[in-house]
């Protein structure tokens, strides 16, 4: 690995033709630090806050170890003050017309442009990243983000008239982050009328500079507040009264801890976890271009994480040879040197990479590193790991920066199996000169972003996110706007925390079933079975639950489902999901309309059932009619789910795909037993999901009646309905590791447990927090909110050019 040369002789320059140093002066960054006497505090409500009796943390140059400044670490009262300032600012900021907010963001973009040299110099100095990446990439993109979201704020009054801002946003950023990560989240939040409190590590002062620039605009100083502190303060910020949403980007385990901490506290949680990306190199690819893609992905200071590299066997030897030769030409050095490719990230990043490499070698992997770096050096040579057995722990672990872990594959099917076999689903690139093969891989990858013959392209108009353990939050494009909006009229999110809940015992066992009185029929009513795998069957518990009518008499029995039945339903759903997701929107629409027609024919039976359970005749008739209409509505909407082209600043289209979540579990509310069941089932099926439902506990018979029409129409296993103790079934679904998403409409305790238990595989959850929902109202029963929760977005980049 070539290192930066210091004052070479003229003869050496003409002999070696190596790059010379191109140092960028950091005088402006030091001057800014000097204006604060090298002691930084927090920026709250447009002012610098330097409270007494706070522990200072050093801000150091990661290359030299020089102490650049000290930053006071926040305590709980500092965070409370920042949240209070954001709450006060929200009252005025959210009431502004979108055009006024857009003008404010435009002014901020001009201020950022005015001070861009200070921004890129300070960012490179304190992070160690190559200055050319910050100067030519991050800072211009930050300006584009402000300008794009200024335009979106102008259009909010028309396009998003039925939505309102969430409120105060708590933003938690990890230690290895760039200020651009903050801008991706701050810009849409401010554009939509929210205010922000950001908790950032004390070693990275660039967010404080951004907050200062925003505060210098004068008006609305409290819309962006930045406090510095350790990661342990994240739960403190997340738990503050008044914080309506928490956006967190960081490590997977930290995300799990935060998910459990926030359970029942009312705040929404958006997670963007992990930094690893994926690159697929096929035998039809331009190998040299793909090698440069690897460099861009992990060794050019654009990415914060490592790379998982899959190479087709027929080009394995050639690709590895060219990659190793390219590694020898990578220049690492001081980030402020404009001629370096890769800077240093500090001792923590170096030690993490060294630990991973050592562990991979101990598990049978082969490691190639270009150049020798002393153990005391802050730099870590680019590392290429290969030959790991598939069962090795490192083969499944997240790859850290700047490590590339290479594995071979034979066929496209095997490549997809290897790529989708990890719990992470962030971003990936596919390198192939055959468009059909590239699209097959791009559509098949379970990730949030796919680039074809490119890597790391970004544009404010294109959504970026992930799936699985990479989190389910989005930034950029229209999806990023909805992260900070909620349907108009939604009340403020208040804590519904149940202090006495025991997570270990909640729903652990079903309630005992005892004789409950005489039956209303002339003969014992036959019990309904569970609807699993396309047919009715007996439960694993071999017991039934009595269902009482409005007079308190037993009208029928339903099966008492348990963990075994949930397991069977989820397995059946996984078998049916691929085929249903591959169906065309027209085919899915036709089946939804057919189910609506079947319910129309069954209208007298369904109305009679509702009346027996206490519904007035007019209400029962209305509920059935609305249920039929909901199926027809989603049958119409499903045909509008095709791919949409996204306009970017680059040549070539970007496809915005809406893909199914996979297996979606739904716990239905007790109220509106037919309408709520259909209103939740229809959008889930329309977006290509396989569904496991727990119907109304008070009146599950309506859902089972609908299943009689589902059986002949839909593939076996696509829809399963399991009856029984709701808390017990909820526990089984929430803890199931093969359920990709869970909607829960029940008690506050159940909502809290679902949020807590979802941390296991970080499934996306949607809970009602114990509050009823007006299913008979179009906005709540068939609104866009259901569509947003029923599918995930994938951005597929198709850039053009050589």
Curated annotation (Swiss-Prot):
<dbReference type="InterPro" id="IPR011408">
    <property type="entry name" value="Aldehyde_DH"/>
</dbReference>
<dbReference type="InterPro" id="IPR016162">
    <property type="entry name" value="Ald_DH_N"/>
</dbReference>
<dbReference type="Pfam" id="PF00171">
    <property type="entry name" value="Aldedh"/>
</dbReference>
<comment type="subunit">
    <text>Interacts with SPG21.</text>
</comment>
<comment type="similarity">
    <text>Belongs to the aldehyde dehydrogenase family.</text>
</comment>
<dbReference type="InterPro" id="IPR016161">
    <property type="entry name" value="Ald_DH/histidinol_DH"/>
</dbReference>
<dbReference type="InterPro" id="IPR016163">
    <property type="entry name" value="Ald_DH_C"/>
</dbReference>
<dbReference type="InterPro" id="IPR015590">
    <property type="entry name" value="Aldehyde_DH_dom"/>
</dbReference>
<protein>
    <recommendedName>
        <fullName>Aldehyde dehydrogenase family 16 member A1</fullName>
    </recommendedName>
</protein>
<dbReference type="GO" id="GO:0016620">
    <property type="term" value="F:oxidoreductase activity, acting on the aldehyde or oxo group of donors, NAD or NADP as acceptor"/>
</dbReference>
């Amino acid at each position: 690995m070539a290192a930066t040369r210091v004052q070479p002789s003229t003869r050496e320059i003409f002999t070696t033709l190596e790059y010379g140093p191109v140092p960028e002066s950091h005088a402006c960054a030091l001057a800014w630090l000097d204006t604060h006497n090298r002691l930084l505090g927090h920026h709250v409500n447009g002012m610098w806050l330097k409270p007494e009796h706070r522990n200072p943390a050093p801000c150091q140059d990661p290359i030299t170890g020089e102490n650049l400044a000290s930053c006071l670490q926040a305590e709980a009262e500092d965070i409370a003050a920042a949240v209070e300032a954001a709450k006060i600012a929200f009252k005025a900021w959210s009431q502004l017309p979108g055009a006024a907010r857009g003008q404010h963001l435009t002014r901020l973009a001009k201020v950022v442009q005015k001070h861009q040299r200070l921004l890129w110099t300070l960012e490179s100095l304190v992070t160690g990243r190559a200055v050319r990446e910050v100067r030519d990439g991050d800072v211009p993109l930050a300006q584009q983000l402000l300008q794009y979201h200024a335009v979106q704020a102008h259009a909010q009054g028309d396009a998003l008239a039925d939505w309102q801002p969430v409120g105060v946003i708590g933003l938690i950023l990890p230690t290895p982050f760039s200020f651009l990560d903050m801008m991706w989240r701050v810009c849409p939040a401010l554009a939509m009328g929210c205010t922000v409190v950001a908790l950032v590590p004390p070693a990275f002062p660039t967010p404080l500079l951004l907050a200062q620039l925003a505060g210098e605009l004068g008006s609305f100083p409290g819309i962006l507040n930045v406090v510095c502190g350790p990661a342990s303060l994240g739960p403190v910020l997340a738990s503050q009264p008044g914080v309506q949403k928490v956006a967190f980007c960081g490590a997977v385990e930290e995300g799990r801890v935060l998910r459990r901490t926030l359970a029942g506290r009312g705040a929404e949680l958006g997670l963007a976890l992990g930094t690893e990306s994926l690159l697929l190199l096929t035998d039809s690819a331009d190998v040299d271009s793909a090698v440069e893609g690897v460099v861009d992905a992990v060794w050019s200071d654009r990415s914060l994480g490592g790379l998982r590299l899959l190479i087709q066997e027929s080009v394995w030897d050639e690709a590895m040879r060219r990659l190793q030769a390219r590694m020898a030409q990578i220049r690492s050095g001081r980030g402020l040197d404009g001629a370096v490719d890769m800077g240093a990230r500090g001792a923590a990043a170096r030690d993490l990479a060294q630990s991973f490499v050592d562990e991979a070698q101990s598990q049978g992997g082969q490691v190639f590193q270009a150049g020798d770096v002393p153990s005391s050096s802050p730099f870590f040579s680019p590392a290429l790991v290969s030959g790991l057995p598939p069962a090795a722990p490192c083969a499944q672990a997240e790859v850290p920066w700047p490590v590339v872990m290479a594995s071979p594959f034979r066929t496209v099917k095997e490549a997809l199996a290897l790529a989708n076999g990890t719990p992470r689903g962030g971003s990936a690139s596919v390198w192939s000169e055959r468009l059909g093969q590239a699209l097959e891989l791009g559509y098949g990858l379970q990730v949030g972003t796919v680039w074809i013959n490119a890597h790391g392209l970004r544009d404010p108009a294109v959504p970026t996110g992930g799936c699985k353990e990479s989190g389910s939050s989005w930034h950029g494009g229209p999806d990023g706007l909805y992260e900070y909006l909620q349907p108009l009229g939604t009340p403020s999110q208040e804590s519904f925390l149940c202090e006495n809940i025991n997570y270990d015992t909640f729903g652990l066992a079903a309630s005992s079933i005892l004789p409950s009185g005489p039956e209303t029929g002339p003969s014992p009513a036959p019990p309904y079975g569970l609807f699993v795998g396309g047919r009715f069957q007996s439960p694993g518990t071999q017991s039934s639950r009595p269902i009482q009518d409005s007079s308190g008499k037993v009208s029928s029995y339903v099966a008492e489902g348990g963990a075994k039945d949930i397991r069977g339903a989820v397995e059946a759903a996984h078998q049916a999901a691929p085929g249903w997701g591959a169906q065309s929107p027209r085919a899915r629409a036709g089946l939804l309309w057919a189910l609506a027609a079947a319910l129309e024919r069954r209208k007298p039976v369904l109305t009679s059932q509702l009346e027996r359970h206490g519904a007035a005749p007019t209400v029962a008739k209305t509920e059935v009619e609305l249920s039929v209409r909901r199926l027809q509505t989603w049958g119409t909407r499903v045909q509008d789910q095709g791919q949409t082209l996204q306009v970017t600043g680059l040549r070539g289209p970007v496809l915005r795909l809406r893909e199914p979540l996979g297996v979606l579990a739904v716990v239905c509310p007790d109220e509106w037993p037919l309408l709520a069941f259909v209103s939740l089932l229809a959008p889930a099926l329309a977006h290509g999901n396989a569904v496991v439902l727990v119907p109304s506990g008070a009146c599950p018979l309506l859902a089972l009646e609908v299943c009689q029409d589902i059986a002949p129409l839909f593939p076996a296993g696509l829809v399963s309905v399991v009856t029984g103790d709701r808390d017990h079934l909820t526990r089984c679904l929430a803890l199931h590791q093969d359920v990709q998403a869970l909607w829960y409409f029940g008690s506050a305790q159940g909502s809290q447990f679902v949020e807590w238990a979802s941390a296991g595989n970080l499934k996306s959850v949607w809970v009602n927090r114990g509050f009823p929902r007006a299913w008979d109202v179009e906005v709540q029963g068939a609104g866009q909110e259901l569509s947003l929760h029923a599918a995930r977005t994938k951005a597929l980049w198709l850039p053009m050019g050589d």
